């Protein structure tokens, strides 16, 4: 989802 995508970019 949108939130999941944002978190993924931050935790990369």
UniProtKB/Swiss-Prot annotation:
Family, similarity comment: Belongs to the peroxidase family. Classical plant (class III) peroxidase subfamily.
Cofactor binding annotation: Binds 1 heme b (iron(II)-protoporphyrin IX) group per subunit. Binds 2 calcium ions per subunit.
Function: Removal of H(2)O(2), oxidation of toxic reductants, biosynthesis and degradation of lignin, suberization, auxin catabolism, response to environmental stresses such as wounding, pathogen attack and oxidative stress. These functions might be dependent on each isozyme/isoform in each plant tissue. Suggested to catalyze the deposition of the aromatic residues of suberin on the cell wall and thus play a role in cell-suberization.
Protein name, per record: Suberization-associated anionic peroxidase 2
Reaction(s) this enzyme catalyzes, per UniProt: 2 a phenolic donor + H2O2 = 2 a phenolic radical donor + 2 H2O
BP term (GO), one: hydrogen peroxide catabolic process
One Gene Ontology cellular component annotation held by this UniProt entry: extracellular region
GO MF term (any one): lactoperoxidase activity
Lineage top rank: taxon: Eukaryota
Keyword annotations: Calcium, Heme, Hydrogen peroxide, Iron, Metal-binding, Oxidoreductase, Peroxidase, Secreted
Subcellular location: Secreted
Keyword Translocase part of the UniProt annotation: no
EC code(s) of this entry: 1.11.1.7
Main localization (coarse): secreted
Cofactor: heme b; Ca(2+)
């Amino acid at each position: 989802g949108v939130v999941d995508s944002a978190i993924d970019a931050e935790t990369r």
